[in-house]
From Swiss-Prot:
Single Gene Ontology MF annotation: carbohydrate derivative binding
InterPro entries per record: RpiR-like_SIS, SIS_dom, SIS_dom_sf, SIS_GmhA/DiaA_subfam, UPF0309
Name of the featured protein: UPF0309 protein TTE0306
Alphabetical list of PROSITE patterns matching this protein: SIS
SUPFAM superfamilies: SIS domain
Transmembrane segments: none
Protein family: Belongs to the UPF0309 family.
Record-linked HAMAP family: UPF0309 (MF_01240)
A single BP term in Gene Ontology: carbohydrate derivative metabolic process
Pfam families assigned: SIS_2 (PF13580)
Length: 246
């Protein structure tokens, strides 16, 4: 099973490479263009385990400082797993959450949801567009073919977003299956691995774009190397008013 899981990761990443590069480049271009202003940021939002995607890009060694992670306590697993599942299906919670953050017209938000079907992530895309933001969705497009939306509009996340990146993950997330007698067990999810790969590809392309435009990418250094503290403090000072969770 160890080998099978690794093989599935390789296979899915190869599919991302062969089918999603243009979408990732489009998203990177859109985000780069939104970062022209001195204190512009882009935002990342996800519910449940997908919130780890926001954490992956936020305050990260080797990552951009201009990333605002939207991490509301209502949707965090460590604040109550059952509560987070309840609110993930609740579209009304989104306006209350987004009102806590400074989301400027013309900025970009990445919304991460493996299924793309629940009320909160779909409403997040709708609300963000209402506020004038550009929406990039990171989701598995397989779900729309196999199930229904839980949002009152009947829409999936991919129906609302400006750019849709398919993480090429499976329906149900779990990728390995064992059948024994009358029992069928599916296990070993992929979405966190695939989302992390895609988001770091996206960020690498954003940084490349910034360099090509003679912009200075505000990249954090690892706090465990010499000289990093002074460098990072300058970036923190620059963006601290925009990043709620610093």
């Amino acid at each position: 099973m160890l080998d099978l899981y690794i093989e599935e990761i390789y296979k899915r990443i190869e599919k991302i490479k062969s089918t999603q590069l243009e979408k990732i480049k489009q998203a990177a271009h859109l985000i780069t263009e939104s970062l022209i202003s001195e204190d512009s940021v882009f935002h990342v939002f996800g519910c449940g385990h997908s919130h780890m995607a926001a954490e992956e890009l936020f305050y990260r060694a080797g990552g951009l400082a201009c990333v605002n992670a939207i991490l509301p306590s209502e949707l965090m697993l460590h604040e109550g797993a059952l509560k987070s599942s309840y609110y993930e299906r609740n579209e009304e919670i989104i306006k209350l959450i987004f009102d806590r953050y400074e989301l400027r017209k013309g900025e970009c938000i990445i919304i991460v949801s493996h299924s793309g079907r629940n009320g909160a992530p779909v409403e997040a895309a709708i609300d963000a567009k209402r506020r004038g933001l550009h929406v990039v969705a990171l989701t598995s497009t397989e779900y729309k073919q196999k199930t229904f939306s839980r949002h009152s509009s009947g829409k999936f996340l991919e129906d609302v977003a400006d750019i849709v990146i398919d993480n090429c993950g499976p329906y149900g997330d779990a990728v390995l299956t064992v059948e024994k007698e009358d029992i069928k067990i599916s296990f070993s999810p992929l979405s966190t691995v695939l989302n992390t790969v895609i988001l770091n590809m996206l960020e690498a392309e954003i940084i490349t774009n910034m360099l090509e435009k003679n912009m200075s990418p505000p990249v954090f250094l690892s706090g465990n190397i010499e000289g990093a503290e002074e460098h990072n403090l300058k970036l923190i000072e620059k963006y601290k008013k925009r990043l709620r969770h610093l």
